[in-house]
A protein has these predicted regions:
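Intrinsic, low-complexity polybasic segments
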Residues: 4-5, 10, 224
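Extended alpha-helical targeting/anchoring segments
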Residues: 13-532
Length: 532
């Protein structure tokens, strides 16, 4: 996964003019007030991780990556830092931080976030990637309490926001196909701007992008997984949970009573584990993306909270008016040989219990998208196909529709939150039971992580297979789907096994990268930092 880079990368073409040209931007300013422009640089000896290491010690930064179809890198990776606006919300209060000032709003988080994003009108340009700037962050599972009558959790020890987003108008886009980097900036067009004002704003963006190119030219010390021995196995040590085994098993039994009485068909119960660690979250992310490459991989650093994860499952995506969701249910390990791999896939597709659960989630997805899609456009593009990843295979379907003209990506998001795979069916009653039995707020777990673009595109995943770092403690939450014939001991063990895969990445990073290694910001040349 990590190629040895023994010499500094060769950067070329950073002196090229911006695209679109300033005269084109002036024309677009008649309709839009935030116009993306970009500068290309050759990056055939770079990697997204290598680039991101230059920014990982900033207070606020993000890296979004992806593997498609389980085994092929998606075309684009996105890197950003130094947001011009920070938005966080909890318990009906939204805090906006900009230019060192704080503003407090008393409003529902999504309504306030929608109002902020609606201030920006940005074009979708064919030659540019789907994300050219916007809000990057997370929605917590408990966000639905603002929109549905749900009981509040009695405990919130993790104490994280219901939403937290970085607004970034400058993005580094790594194009894996063309082996080049797009340095993307956005020209802000103020009300009443003259052509000369727009030219000045354009020139300022050009200056910032050139400063970024100069900063990226700085040599980065080579560092790859090959530089350290990868342990075959690691001891996890002491692991703490927010519930005892007896409590979890009791919760499963109670959930089965609700199922037998006809309240629900399924409910997903979870527990949160934590361990103390001195591992670098970035090194943990490097291990994770190697052990478990996934469609959604992310590193979000927001002050004293860092979230890293490799989620296999989309929540909802909106791109150019098309809305889609990808239910995943049904899992088997990968086979040692190709013959065994094929046999395991056939066994999975013939498993009636796995098929029934998957069909239920596909129906949920069709219903969710039906609420925001044009009549007759919701369809199942792919149904019950096997998607292979490094260690496991899943049954995956793809449901899509055409977004109604009176709806936007916020409507699509709310129609799908939370996913049935982390709540149950029917959703609302399952969530009530989760609040009753789990008692402790889930925080980011089972919510969503992704981007909300200024241009109207959105891509979010379900927050699973994710680690939250707060100070020197790492938190991992995992759940199991409870149905009428669930075996409580087995469901408990399923949550433990899921969590162990993430905790193993932490212990592996500790073994491979000792805490005595100096952080990379010790070699940052401040001359190359820019101020957005």
């Amino acid at each position: 996964m990590f190629s040895p880079l023994g010499s500094a990368p060769i950067w070329k073409g950073s002196d090229l003019m911006l695209t679109p040209h300033v005269e084109q931007v002036i024309t677009m300013a008649n309709e839009f007030n935030l116009i993306p422009v970009y500068k290309k640089v050759l990056a055939d000896m770079e990697t997204p991780i290598r680039i991101f290491r230059r920014y990982a010690e900033r207070d606020r930064a993000f890296l979004l990556e992806s593997v498609e179809g389980g085994e092929q890198w998606a075309r684009h990776s996105f890197i950003g830092t130094d947001p011009f606006l920070m938005v966080s919300g909890k318990k009906g209060r939204l805090i906006l931080e900009q230019h060192g000032k704080r503003q407090i709003l008393n409003d529902k988080p999504l309504e306030a976030l929608k109002a902020l994003l609606r201030k920006y009108r940005s074009p979708k340009l064919k030659e540019m990637p789907p994300f050219t700037g916007g809000a990057i962050g997370f929605f917590g599972y408990d966000l639905l309490q603002y929109y549905e009558k749900l009981p509040e959790h009695s405990v919130d020890d993790l104490n994280m926001d219901d939403i937290r987003f970085m607004f970034c108008d400058q993005v580094i886009v790594f194009d894996h196909v063309k082996q080049q980097i797009l340095l993307v900036g956005n020209v802000h067009v103020g009300e009443g701007y003259s052509d000369e004002d727009i030219r000045a704003a354009y020139a300022e963006v050009e200056r910032k992008l050139e400063a970024t190119a100069q900063y990226l030219r700085k040599q980065t010390p080579p560092e790859t997984l090959g530089a350290a021995s990868i342990p075959d196995d690691v001891e996890l040590g002491e692991i703490q949970s927010n519930v005892t085994k007896e409590q979890f098993i009791s919760n499963v039994e109670q959930a089965k009573e609700y199922i037998r009485s006809g309240d629900i068909f399924q409910v997903v119960l979870s527990q949160r584990f934590h361990i103390d660690t001195d591992a670098s979250p970035l090194q943990v992310y490097r291990v994770l993306r190697t052990m478990n490459p996934s469609p959604y991989m992310y590193y979000l650093k927001m002050d004293d909270e860092i979230i890293v994860g490799t989620s296999p499952e989309a929540l909802v995506k909106v791109e150019n008016g098309r809305v889609e969701t990808r239910p995943i249910a049904g899992t088997r390990p990968r086979g040692v040989t190709e013959t065994e791999d094929i046999a395991l896939a056939e066994e999975l597709l013939k498993d009636e219990k796995e098929r029934a659960e998957h069909l239920m989630l596909v129906d949920l997805g069709r219903n969710d998208l039906g609420r925001v899609s044009q009549f007759g456009t919701v369809k199942c593009d792919t149904f019950m196909e096997i998607e292979r990843y490094s260690h496991v295979m899943h049954i995956v379907s793809n449901v899509s529709g055409k977004l109604r003209e009176d709806k936007d990506f916020f409507d699509a998001f709310l129609s799908c939150l939370p996913a049935g795979t982390v709540s149950g069916a029917p959703k609302l009653r399952a969530m009530e039971i989760i609040a009753e039995l789990e008692r402790e707020a889930r925080g980011p777990y089972a919510g969503a992580i992704g981007y909300l673009g200024f241009s109207g595109n959105m891509d979010t995943c379900i927050t699973i297979r994710t680690i939250v770092f707060k100070k020197n403690r790492a938190y991992v939450q995992a759940g199991a789907g409870i149905v009428w014939d669930s075996v409580p001991e087995s469901e408990y063990q399923e949550t433990v096994n899921k969590a162990k895969a993430m905790l193993k990445a932490i212990r592996t990073a500790e073994a491979m990268f000792p805490a005595t290694v100096q952080p990379y910001n010790s070699v940052i040349n401040q001359d190359y930092l820019y101020t957005p």
